[in-house]
Swiss-Prot record:
GO terms for cellular component: cytosol. The gene is hemE. The record marks 77 as: Transition state stabilizer. The lineage of its organism: Bacteria, Pseudomonadati, Pseudomonadota, Betaproteobacteria, Burkholderiales. It catalyses: uroporphyrinogen III + 4 H(+) = coproporphyrinogen III + 4 CO2. This is Uroporphyrinogen decarboxylase. Its main location: cytoplasm. The keyword Lyase applies. Substrate binds at residues 27-31, 77, 157, 212, 333. Pathway: Porphyrin-containing compound metabolism; protoporphyrin-IX biosynthesis; coproporphyrinogen-III from 5-aminolevulinate: step 4/4. It comes from Cupriavidus pinatubonensis (strain JMP 134 / LMG 1197). Catalyzes the decarboxylation of four acetate groups of uroporphyrinogen-III to yield coproporphyrinogen-III. The keyword Lyase applies. Homodimer.
Length: 363
């Protein structure tokens, strides 16, 4: 077990005292960085990048070499699991992901099975390689986060065959054939648990479940078709490895209505989008979980003074409900590819500067 130079992120997830508020950014390794685009060009395609452990390691470390971030996140894609199920994933230029064999019929659903994790070995090799690359002077720079899509979010792509504006195909199945939908979700939950456990075995020190499309569901349907299956995933997770606790984060975009339910999933932390008031979220969850978030990503297109002001507003909102511990700063969703890299430097600087100042004033 290599000691960490900076364990602030892990301590915040455990709601332990920290000297400042740690931060990382969703999609921190991405198209807003010129060095990422150069590596992707060498890889030839997005999947060529994501399925090559050496390239995945290179792009995972790029934002850490540019900014003093407090965690690394595995460079991969949420659709690796359904790809391993044989649905035929591809990425068309400018169109996003597509599955050649979506789940549309009862026969399609009956054939679905938890994939052999050996088919995802490239992901676990990347985790191990990133862990090695993070070691500097005998100590690991920051912790590494592993991740997966949620069972429901994966199902949206698996049934729709790609992205969707209205999710009418997957929702038609959910309302009309809930038995088929539950079968897909049950298999997905088993697969995601196994997938995250294999990432933990390979060296992930925290894991996150991205429920990107949970917010598309009606109240009641969310609890039955998304929340229940994230709870299943969490129940199947190894929460300790190599003598260390492995914190788990759940994030439902558009999930502000269901914070109490998310706090009861067994997760250590809840990710929040920018529509949620942090002080209210803290009161509603009763301090049972850490909170992660939640600045609007488009703030990064504003002038420096406005970015700094908005950062302070997020930190003040969290602190208003009782001190600054138990908070990981992040965006409310992934960083835009058009974000100026220098704006990210401003955000990182202000989070670290002002959160230290807040702790001093809190005594």
């Amino acid at each position: 077990m290599t000691a960490l130079q900076n364990d602030t992120f892990l301590r915040a997830l455990r709601r332990q005292p920290t000297e400042y508020t740690p931060l990382w950014l969703m999609r921190q390794a991405g198209r807003y960085l010129p060095e990422y685009n150069a590596t992707r060009a060498r890889a030839g395609s997005f999947l060529g990048l994501a399925k090559n452990p050496a390239y995945a390691t290179e792009v995972t470390l790029q934002p850490l070499d540019r900014y003093p971030l407090d965690a690394a996140i595995l460079f991969s894609d949420i659709l690796t699991v359904p790809d391993a199920m044989g649905l035929g994933l591809s990425f068309a230029q400018g169109e996003g992901p597509r599955f050649a064999r979506p789940l549309r019929t009862e026969a399609d659903v009956q054939k679905l099975a938890v994939p052999d994790m050996a088919s995802l070995q490239y992901v676990f090799d990347a985790v191990a390689e990133i862990r090695r690359a993070l070691v500097q002077d005998g100590r690991q720079r920051v912790p590494l986060i592993g991740f997966s899509g949620s069972p429901w979010t994966l199902a949206c792509y698996m049934v729709e065959g790609g992205g969707s504006d209205d999710f009418r195909t997957v929702k038609a199945m959910m309302y009309g054939r809930p038995d088929l939908m539950h079968r897909i979700l049950d298999i997905n939950a088993q697969a995601v648990s196994e997938y995250l456990n294999a990432q933990i075995e390979a060296g992930a020190q925290a894991v996150m479940i991205f429920d990107t499309w949970g917010g598309a569901l009606a109240d009641g349907m969310y609890q039955a078709f998304s929340l229940a299956y994230m709870r299943k995933v969490l129940a199947g997770l190894k929460r300790e490895h190599d003598g260390q606790q492995i914190p788990a984060i759940v994030f439902t975009k558009g999930g502000g209505l269901w914070l109490e339910g998310l706090a009861d999933t067994g997760a250590d932390a809840i990710g929040l989008d920018w529509t949620v008031n942090l002080a209210q979220a803290r009161r509603r969850t009763g301090g049972r979980v850490a909170l992660q978030g939640n600045i609007d990503p488009t703030v990064l297109f504003a002038p420096e003074a406005a970015i700094r002001e908005q950062v302070r507003g997020v930190l003040d909102s969290y602190a208003a409900a009782g001190g600054s511990d138990g908070h990981v700063f992040n965006l409310g969703h992934g960083i835009s590819q058009f974000t100026p890299p220098e704006s990210v430097a401003v955000l990182v600087d202000e989070v670290h500067r002002y959160s230290r100042q807040l702790r001093t004033s809190q005594g």
